């Protein structure tokens, strides 16, 4: 068994066979050699693509299925090895504790159209260790029946919130389509006479007109979510089932998904996008009498007013403009800027309470 003493580089080396295998998997996926068993996945450059590769190799080598949100509860080789040694089945849940520590009031973030919470990883960390941060992933992603309306999503997520925080005031936020669900959650809380201390919308429009044809979402899977170019896999004007097969094969060759990632899993993801898009299209926001903050990019300027249309539903909306575009607003260099705006708003709301 390897020694637990730190090596020459200060990293703690693996101490048993499980840690050794996991460390090899992490190094191969991340293409980084200087990793120890106590290094945080996100600190060493981990992303959702890396996480997908790692869980795929773990599935083959250990015969265990780890959900992507494992990287928030077990963010080191050491803690992940503990899960694998325990051999217990991991519960799938909608509410993911992405940063559960801290003394401030928790902030709850709703998933985007993709259904996972990985978009919020950098924002959660940029908010600092004193800000508890929980993310909601879609029920279909978490292993149960998907919710088909925004209202149903909001009801389900409010039940989960109260397991962490039984009474208000609550702090809610959402990026893109997640902001629409957060809005409905605040409206439902008002009906329960439960206060919402903060409602934060990040580059969110109140009304959407998302395409509902399968071809659009197949193309989007190829471009955005699997990192593939349509031209590279020659998808143009081919039937959807052939496109899906080509996407899967190209993604496996590029190690963007595990080798045993099957067509059923890709089909499930496609159905999730279609269901979520239909739910957002059908929803019409209700008036909300509480205060809210809209953090928006300059990109969202195609004829919309400063509030992106939210002024029709509230008189108490503040707007904060931030650089970047819609797809990058909460990641990379933008994450600390958004986090600063969020923290400032939460502090102001707390002082004004």
Listing of model-derived features with the role each one plays in the protein:
Residues 1-92, 151, 155, 204-211, ...:
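Phosphopantetheine-dependent thiolation modules in NRPS/PKS and related acyl-activating systems
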Residues 78, 82-353:
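A hydrolase-biased, glycine/serine/histidine/acidic-enriched motif that marks catalytic-domain neighborhoods
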């Amino acid at each position: 068994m390897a020694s637990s003493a730190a090596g020459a580089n200060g990293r703690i080396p693996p101490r048993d066979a499980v840690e050794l295998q996991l460390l090899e998997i992490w190094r191969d996926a991340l293409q980084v050699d200087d990793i120890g068993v106590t290094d945080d996945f996100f600190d060493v450059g981990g992303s959702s693509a890396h996480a997908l590769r790692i869980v795929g190799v773990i599935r083959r080598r250990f015969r265990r299925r780890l959900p992507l949100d494992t990287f928030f509860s077990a963010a080191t080789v050491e803690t992940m090895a503990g899960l694998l040694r325990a051999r217990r089945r991991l519960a799938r849940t909608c509410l993911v504790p992405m940063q559960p520590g801290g003394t401030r009031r928790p902030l709850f973030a709703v998933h985007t159209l993709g259904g996972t919470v990985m978009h919020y990883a950098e924002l959660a960390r940029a908010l600092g260790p004193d800000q508890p941060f929980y993310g909601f992933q879609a029920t279909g992603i978490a292993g149960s029946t998907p919710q088909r309306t925004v209202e149903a999503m909001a009801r389900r997520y409010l039940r989960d919130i109260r397991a962490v925080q039984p009474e208000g005031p609550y702090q809610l936020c959402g990026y893109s389509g997640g902001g629409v669900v957060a809005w409905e959650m605040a409206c439902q809380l008002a009906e329960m006479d439960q206060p919402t201390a903060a409602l934060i919308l990040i580059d969110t429009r109140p009304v959407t007109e998302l395409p509902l044809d399968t071809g659009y979402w197949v193309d989007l899977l190829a471009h955005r979510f699997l990192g593939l170019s349509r031209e590279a896999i020659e998808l143009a004007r081919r039937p959807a089932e052939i496109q899906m097969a080509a996407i899967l094969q190209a993604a496996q060759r590029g190690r963007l998904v595990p080798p045993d990632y099957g067509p059923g899993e890709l089909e499930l993801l496609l159905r999730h996008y279609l269901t979520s898009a239909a739910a957002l299209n059908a929803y019409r926001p209700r008036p909300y009498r509480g205060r809210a903050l809209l953090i928006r990019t300059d990109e969202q300027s195609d004829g919309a007013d400063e509030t992106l249309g939210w002024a029709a539903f509230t008189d108490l909306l503040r707007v904060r403009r931030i650089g970047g575009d819609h797809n990058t607003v909460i990641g990379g260099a933008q994450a600390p800027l958004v986090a600063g705006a969020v923290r400032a708003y939460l502090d102001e709301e707390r002082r004004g309470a």
